Amino acid sequence: MKRAVLALAVLLPTLALAAEANAPAKSEPKDSKFLVDYLSQTQKDFLKSIDGLSEAQWKFKPAPERWSVAEVAEHIILSEEMFGENISGKVLKTPAATAEQKAKTQGLEDKILQGIPDRTNKFKAPEKLQPASKFASAKEAAQAFKARRDANIALAKTTPESELRSHVSGPSPMGDLDAYQWMLFMAAHAKRHVAQIEEVVADPSFPKK
C-alpha cells in the first residue's frame, strides 16, 4: 500500500497538469451508473486494443525510446493495481469527509474526464510503474487486466454512491479526491494509454501480422 501511495505521488502531478489545461468550464453531475458504465467501456476499449495481436505486433517498438504495445499494456495494468489498492485500502478507509472536504471536491469530475485522457502533453511514468516485460503475450495481459478491472467494477457496483462520495483523500495536485473521483481517474488513465496503444498500431512500420 505504501508503495502504491508513493507511486501516485509521482504520477499524479504530471497528469494533473493535463487535467487543468483541458478542463471544461462547468462540471455536470455524475452518478453510480455513469461510473460503472465508464469503467466497463474503458475495460472493453483496452481489451479490444490488444485482442489478437501476434508476438511481433505485441513487442513492436516504433522507436527505441518509445514503448511497445506490451509495455503500454503493462503500465496500464500496474497502474490499475495501484489505483485499486489506493481506493480500497486507503481512500475508503478514511474517516467520513467533512462538509469542507466535500466542497473542495466539487466540479472535479469533468476535469478528470476531459484532461487525463488527453495526450497533448506526455510525461514519463514513475519507476514503479515502468514496464519490465512481465507479460509474454497479449492474452496473458488481457487476463490480468480483466481480473483487476472486474474487481474494481464490482467495488463500484456494491459500494453506494453516497459511500464513495463520503471518503476523501490525496495525494493529488488537483486537490483531494473522493473515492468516486479516484475511480474515474483510474479509468481515464487507462483511456489515455489505450490512445497510446492506438498510436503504436497506427505506425507505418507496425507488423502486418
What are these regions (language model features)?
Residues 30-78:
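N-terminal secretory signal peptides
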Residues 14, 33-36, 40, 120-123, ...:
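Domain-scale detector for complete catalytic domains at protein termini or as standalone homologs
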Residues 35, 39, 138-145, 183-186:
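Hydrophobic packing residues in well-ordered alpha-helices of helical domains and bundles
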Residues 60, 64-108, 150, 157-158, ...:
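Short, contiguous alpha-helical
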Residues 1-4:
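Positively charged n-region of N-terminal signal peptides that target proteins for export
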Residues 7-16:
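Bacterial N-terminal signal peptides
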Residues 42-49, 79, 83, 119-123, ...:
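Amphipathic, well-ordered alpha-helical segments in soluble domains
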Residues 19-34, 85-143, 171-177, 204-209:
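Short, helix-capping/interhelical loops that line the mouth of catalytic, cofactor-
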